[in-house]
């Protein structure tokens, strides 16, 4: 499969006939937000997410995330038969993954060497719940503190945000007020309590 980069730093409109990869690209993007292979809208009769997007040991999806203080990358890779994540504290550079002959490096050690020692590379994040906690800022637990800088929002109550994003990506009918209220409720740090006395 040829190497491809897609810039998504503004409004993007995908057009094309059936089977050219529009939904494939949207699902890869949705996976960044929901990290839930069962909720990507892949029909049961199609190949699984892992089999389709990561057919080879050197298959990767790299997401570059822009933030106020610079960019970082989220690397999705297959390890021990399932997709896991690593965070790289640097803007994306294709030279990390592709050699001068335009071939993708086959070993993680080669990629690590290309990234170099000057950029932080996280340990493997194998739990999808932990990954979502990292990017949605539910990071008060001690083991998540090194990942705090990778949060795209800061909320312990983020659970409805990935669902709402998923519904937008999968063209589910949504009301704008529902989306707005979901985001507002997710950002609130207040604990709601109900007095039954």
Locate each region found by the language model:
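Extended, Lys/Glu-rich alpha-helical coiled-coil stalks
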Residues: 119-197
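Generic recognition of flexible, low-complexity loop/linker segments
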Residues: 2-3, 48-51, 168-171
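Generic structural signal for hydrophobic core residues of well-folded globular domains
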Residues: 17, 29, 33, 186-191
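Nucleotide-state sensing region of NTPase/ATPase domains
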Residues: 47-147
């Amino acid at each position: 499969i040829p190497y491809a980069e897609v810039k998504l730093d503004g409004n993007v409109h995908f057009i094309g006939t059936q089977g050219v990869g529009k939904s494939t690209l949207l699902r890869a993007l949705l996976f960044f937000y929901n990290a839930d292979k069962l909720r990507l809208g892949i029909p049961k009769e199609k190949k699984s997410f892992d089999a389709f997007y990561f057919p080879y040991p050197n298959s990767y999806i790299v997401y570059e995330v822009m933030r106020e203080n610079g960019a970082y990358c989220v690397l999705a890779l297959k390890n021990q038969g399932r997709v896991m994540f690593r965070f790289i504290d640097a803007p994306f550079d294709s030279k990390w993954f592709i050699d001068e002959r335009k071939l993708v490096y086959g070993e993680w050690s080669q990629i690590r060497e290309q990234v170099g020692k000057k950029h932080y590379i996280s340990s493997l994040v194998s739990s999808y719940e932990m990954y979502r906690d990292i990017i949605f800022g539910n990071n008060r637990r001690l083991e998540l503190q090194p990942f705090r800088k990778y949060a795209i929002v800061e909320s312990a109550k983020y659970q409805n945000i990935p669902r709402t994003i998923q519904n937008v990506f999968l063209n589910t009918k949504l009301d704008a007020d529902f989306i707005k209220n979901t985001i507002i409720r997710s950002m609130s740090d207040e604990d709601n309590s109900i007095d039954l006395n």
